[in-house]
Amino acid sequence: MAQILGENLTLGYDGKAVLQGLNFTVEAGDYLCIVGENGSGKTTLMKTLLGLQPPLAGAIRFGDGLTRQDIGYLPQQTEVQRDFPALVREIVRSGFQGRCGLRPFYTRAEKAEAERMLQKVGAADLAGRCYRELSGGQQQRVLLARALCAARRALLLDEPVTGLDPDAAAAMYGL
C-alpha cells in the first residue's frame, strides 16, 4: 500500500468546497508538488493530511506504518510567526514536541539532533539568537530545521519560499 492514499476527497473551508474528487497516492521517496491559484485548496489539503481539519468527503489513509506523528510540516509563514519571541534553538527543538508525550523536557539526543538540523540548513550560528530578529530567509531556514526534527518519514512544505529573494529561494531548494 502507498504511504499516503487520498480517496475521492472533497476539501473546503468556511463551509465551501474548493476541491472535489481528488484521488492520489504518495509512495516512499516521492516528491509531490501541489500547484494552484490562491484559495484553490493547497493549504487545506496540507491541513487535512496533518489531521488539522477533516475532509468534507472521502478519506486519507496511511500505509507502510506511517502515522501523522511521522510527518514534519513547514507551514506558510504568518506575521505572528515572524514576531515570535523565542530563541532559535527553542523553536527548532519544538519540532520534537509531538514525540514528548507527558515528558516535559527534550532528551540529549533530541537536543543534538536539533543542532544537526540547524547545521544542515546553514543556521547553526543563529541558535542563540531571538527568532524575531532574523531576516525572512533566516526564519525560513529555522522553520525548516524544526520541520526536519519533526519529520521521521515525510515532510510537507507549504509555500516554503514565499517572500524570499531569488538567492534565498535557490538556497532553500538546495537543501
Region locations from a protein language model:
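Conserved ABC transporter NBD signature motif
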Residues: 55-71
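Conserved ABC ATPase signature
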Residues: 130-134, 138
